[in-house]
UniProtKB/Swiss-Prot annotation:
Keywords: Repressor, Stress response, Transcription, Transcription regulation. GO terms for biological process: negative regulation of DNA-templated transcription. Negative regulator of class I heat shock genes (grpE-dnaK-dnaJ and groELS operons). Prevents heat-shock induction of these operons. InterPro entries: GAF-like_dom_sf, HrcA, HrcA_C, WH-like_DNA-bd_sf, WH_DNA-bd_sf, WHTH_HrcA_DNA-bd, WHTH_transcript_rep_HrcA_IDD. It comes from Streptococcus equi subsp. zooepidemicus (strain MGCS10565). Belongs to the HrcA family. This is Heat-inducible transcription repressor HrcA. GO terms for molecular function: DNA binding.
Amino acid sequence: MITERQSNILNLIVDLFTQTHEPVGSKALQSVIASSSATIRNDMAKLEKLGLLEKAHTSSGRMPSAAGFKYFVEHSLNLGSIDEQDFYQLVKAFDFEAFKLEDVLLRASQMLSDMTGYTAAILDVEPARQRLTGFDIVQLSSHDALAVLTLDESKPLTVQFAIPKNFMNRDLLVLKGIVADRLLGKDVMTVHYKLRTEIPQIVQKYFTVTDNVLDLFDYIFVGLFRETIFVSGKVAALDYAGLVTYQFLDEEQRLALSIRQSLSEEEMATVQVADSSEPALANVTLLTYKFLIPYRGFGLLSLIGPVDMDYRRSVSLINVIGQLLAVKLRDYYRYLNSNHYEVH
């Protein structure tokens, strides 16, 4: 455990270093810390011995270690802080008309990435927490059709497919009836379970050849079990992390899993400093913020960047964007659920 003065010294060094990326000497701290230069140097030496500070090769100053950043985050960082300038700037950026949920999510990830210079990712409600509330098949021609799946009465998913060659005219209606009878209204995990257990038995009752029918079921429904995730600023990873992290960001389902694992069920926000179990994220910082998606659940907004990022600034930005997201989505879903008639 460190003393209050040592904690103040560490906090100040973190703040100065994240703004200048230059090692900090004892003289730079004297105007804020009411102690002699010798006392400050002794405290800096103790912090170095504890592994919270480290020497710079080209300077007599000190800079925070990964452990020092982690200590700062755990003991001094206010995860609820907001900068008013960020708020007013981002309010203007959120003043746009959204035609679908994805427009709002993508805009949020782009803004967070643009304003930090790092990588931002945003996730929709976890698939397991969604329900299949609508299903239809629209035949486009004699050879292809479009399946329209609706989640939580508001999120559409469309899948275009070639009609199997052995299908008769009635078979698409039969398939639609099976879905309506057995899968509609069920949560996604139940849908997944029934596709593996109950549906194969039912298909045998209605179809002579079942293999391609079951393949079609899998093809239509596989999208239900994938995370909806938008990632912005991937190229920035080459600057703050390297090729391994950059390549990992293209594996969006693995990235989504790592983000979900960084936050417990009870937490609304968290910061992982070089602490991810995923090797590609083991040497970076992962900030994650949970935001409300009305009527449906929670989404996650994450910022991925270097260990020596400006934490106060990053936390402010992710908080502001998260709060504006909730407001924007509330208005969006309120509009979807309203009776909107325009009289001329």
